[in-house]
């Protein structure tokens, strides 16, 4: 999704005030080379159930399934990407979708398959 304005101030304002139907598109991540060749699509919005690989940060190289997609904060939670709180409980570490790569798609939804076919054409 391309932002028309050049000023960083206005880009930040757009992301902060974006409606939920656009936030889903903003929460896109690139596909692995194998998936890219198979489906002919470069990136897709992340969904719960997708298997992703962390490409940046302290958890680089970790693979896991997406447990939650937080559209309000632009973050995702992945199995195996956790940290401990001071009381010892494990909580998911929030990741930005630009820092992960989709390794396996969750294709339980038939609409998603149609979206992929439409975008590949």
UniProtKB/Swiss-Prot annotation:
Sorted alphabetically, the keyword list is: Ribonucleoprotein, Ribosomal protein, RNA-binding, rRNA-binding
Alphabetical list of Pfam families matching this protein: KOW, Ribosomal_L26
SMART domains per UniProt: KOW
Its Gene Ontology cellular component terms are:
cytosolic large ribosomal subunit
- List the GO biological process terms: cytoplasmic translation; ribosomal large subunit biogenesis
GO function terms (MF aspect): RNA binding; rRNA binding; structural constituent of ribosome
The UniProt similarity line reads: Belongs to the universal ribosomal protein uL24 family.
Task of the protein: One of two assembly initiator proteins, it binds directly to the 5'-end of the 23S rRNA, where it nucleates assembly of the 50S subunit.
Q: How does it assemble?
A: Part of the 50S ribosomal subunit.
Name of the protein: Large ribosomal subunit protein uL24
